[in-house]
Structure formats: structure tokens, C-alpha cells
């Protein structure tokens, strides 16, 4: 199985050459300014990709997932959106989480220490593929 991982495309996803693979993973900052319109274009782009499965998590620029979560999730029809949640595909257990330590005033920021640790403590021990926008400490 071939996993293809991309990140930080900032609405420039149509400008990159994506390698072939079985599962396409976008690990956040998929949007430029975080609008639903940008997200709709991203979902259309996901539909055009040949990968059997697509997985998406939000990053600190992906405001619509934080500010308009129901609307944002409804727009994603061609990928699995993970936010502190699991997904099992073809025998692999994935976990996706968008949280990063506070950095200026971006989306999905939590204070270092117990606040962010509480999110990362949710990650199951049997996770095969961990998808985060920033690396969790100690993993």
C-alpha cells in the first residue's frame, strides 16, 4: 500500500503534481484564508484524484473547520475528514488531529501542557498512521 502525504498547499493544490498511490493524505493548511468557497474547490479537486481513498485534517489556516464546522464537514464529500477521530482503511488504523501549540492567533491552537495533551491523550495506542498538522511531543 502506498500512502501519499501532502500538507500546507494553502489553496494551491491544483499547482502540485501528486504522486500515484492508494491513499492521499492532506495534513492541514489546505486553504488559503479558510473559506468555505476554497474548501468546495478542494473537495472538487479530491474528486479528480485517482487515489482510492483521501484523508483530510485541518491546519491552523483552515478556519472554516473551526468557525463553521457543520458547513465545512458537509462540503467534504470526496475525502474522509478527521478531527480527533479514527478511520480504518484496508486494515490500517488512522487517527487525525488538527491541534498545534499556540502560535499567534491561528485556528486549532491550544496552550502547551494539559490542554493540548488532553487531545493527544485520545490517540489510541494501536494507531498505525497518525496524521497531525504539527508533531505531538513525545511521539
Map each language-model feature to its residues.
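Extreme N-terminal starter segment of soluble prokaryotic enzymes
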Residues: 1-3
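Active-site-proximal loop/helix segment associated with metal-binding centers of metalloenzymes
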Residues: 21-23, 56, 92-139
